[in-house]
Amino acid sequence: MGVFVKLGAEYFSSAELVFYRSLFGLVVIYLIIRLQGLSLATPNLKMHFWRGFSGFVALMLFFYALSVLPLATAITLNYTSPLFLAMFTTVMLREGPRPLLIFTIILGFAGVVFLLRPTLHAEQLNAGLLGLLSGFFAGIAYLNVKQLGAMGEPEWRVVFYFTLFCTLGGGIWMLFHSFHA
């Protein structure tokens, strides 16, 4: 996906790329849901909102980073999401800080810094921070997915509401920014 976003970023904004990616996925998952006669009703709409919001922000930031930074750099920054997820589960789910986990999280971030130091130029610092934030928000989104699963939400419903949120969010964002025909 990263390669296609990088290529598409020459012609489309991040909001447009998120919108079109999500719209296609929304249509497909909606058709599957309807063909199988599944229900979209959920008692966990608030949690779906937070999962959609965090995933949308992560996707927007990731697509922006892909448009500005070298492909490998943007992907490396986004791939910090498991490190953030490990931190979130320790704090938010009260899984307790284990010394080995803390050490591996620090080691993981040190590795990211080591990998990026020679490739991230001063003028790319803001884009780099936004790319890192994409990993942060993706970690939150993954935590939300774990919580939704614990609430008994099926995967297809989680995917539907996420793509719906991203389609709406990307569409609204496009209204306030440049649009490419």
Predicted regions and their residues:
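Hydrophobic/small/kink-forming positions within alpha-helical transmembrane segments
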Residues: 3, 30, 52-60, 82-87, ...
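Alpha-helical transmembrane segments of compact multi-pass small-molecule transporters, enriched
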Residues: 24-28, 77-91, 106-107, 165-169
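Loop-to-transmembrane-helix transition segments
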Residues: 34-61, 126-134, 181
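C-terminal transmembrane-helix exit sites in multi-pass transporters
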Residues: 37, 64, 81-103
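Hydrophobic alpha-helical transmembrane segments in multi-pass integral membrane proteins
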Residues: 60-68, 113-120, 166-181
